[in-house]
Amino acid sequence: MANHEQIIEAIKEMSVLELNDLVKAIEEEFGVTAAAPVAVAGAAGGADAAAEKTEFDVELTSAGSSKIKVVKAVKEATGLGLKDAKELVDGAPKVIKEALPKEEAEKLKEQLEEVGATVEIK
C-alpha cells in the first residue's frame, strides 16, 4: 500500500481533468461530496422555523435518461448558455435555482420532472 507522500506526489503530477475525475470517483466510492459545508444559523422558533420558510432551492439530483431534454429545460429555466446548462446538468447533484418562492420552486420541479430529471426542493 502506498504511503501518504507517494499519494501526494501522484496527485501533484495530475492534470486538472485527472483531478476532477479522481474527485468524482472518490465521491462515488465513499458516498460523499466535495462541496464545502455551509454553516446554518439556528432558528429561534424551533418547530416554527419550518413553517416560516419562504424561499426554496431547486436541486437537480439526476438528469435521468433524457439528458438533452433536461439540458434544454435547465437552459430555459436559468437563462444560462447551452454550454453552462450542460455543465450544470453533468455536475448533478447541483442547485439549479436558489431562493425561489414555493410556487415557483414547485413549478420548476414539475417542468424538470416532465423531461425525465430527478429534482428535490430544499
Swiss-Prot record:
One of its GO terms (cellular component) is cytosolic large ribosomal subunit. InterPro entries: Ribosomal_bL12 (IPR000206), Ribosomal_bL12_C (IPR013823), Ribosomal_bL12_C/ClpS-like (IPR014719), Ribosomal_bL12_oligo (IPR008932), Ribosomal_bL12_oligo_N_sf (IPR036235). One of its GO terms (molecular function) is mRNA binding. It comes from the Bacteria. SUPFAM superfamilies: ClpS-like, Ribosomal protein L7/12, oligomerisation (N-terminal) domain. The keyword Transmembrane does not apply. Pfam families: Ribosomal_L12, Ribosomal_L12_N. Keywords: Ribonucleoprotein, Ribosomal protein. Homodimer. Part of the ribosomal stalk of the 50S ribosomal subunit. Forms a multimeric L10(L12)X complex, where L10 forms an elongated spine to which 2 to 4 L12 dimers bind in a sequential fashion. Binds GTP-bound translation factors. Forms part of the ribosomal stalk which helps the ribosome interact with GTP-bound translation factors. Is thus essential for accurate translation. This is Large ribosomal subunit protein bL12.
